[in-house]
Amino acid sequence: MRDLTTAMSDLPRDLEEEVLSRVQLASLRAVRTTCKKWNRRLSKYRFTKKYIRKSRSATADKEFLAIMMLDSSLYLMNVVIDKIDNENNVESSIERKGKLISVNDADGVDIISVVHYNALLLCLTKEKTPKACGLEPLSWAIKVDRNCLSLRFI
């Protein structure tokens, strides 16, 4: 008798992307550490665009992610618009999904300033010698110079 099981790595690329695009945002970190191929797939810009497009259409533009600066730290926030009445009053809920931290510093990174330019967040850190770091929100890739901290969302 033949074994009819199929490993995830044996799936066609389109089907694999479809499966990975259904993973909840909160579980993406666990999925990324499962295998190198999945991590590469999740890091690709094409997949990220497809993932965002799918999540936008699924929530009908009533739920989105935002990055907010609070108390010298950057937070990834999930914003859900519950209701908009006839007078454009909005009922919404905001939930913190993650905080931008330094890999070397468990307490976090103190950010002085954030500038958004061409789909890139440029952050200036508050230290003895301020450092500039760039964060590309679509792929969560960190663009840094050699003197900059390593940053990630937790």
Curated annotation (Swiss-Prot):
Domain F-box, chain residue ranges per copy: 5-51
Domain of life (superkingdom): Eukaryota
Pfam families for this protein: F-box (PF00646)
Entries under InterPro entries matching the protein: F-box-like_dom_sf (IPR036047), F-box_dom (IPR001810)
PROSITE patterns noted in UniProt: FBOX
Record-given protein name: Putative F-box protein At2g11200
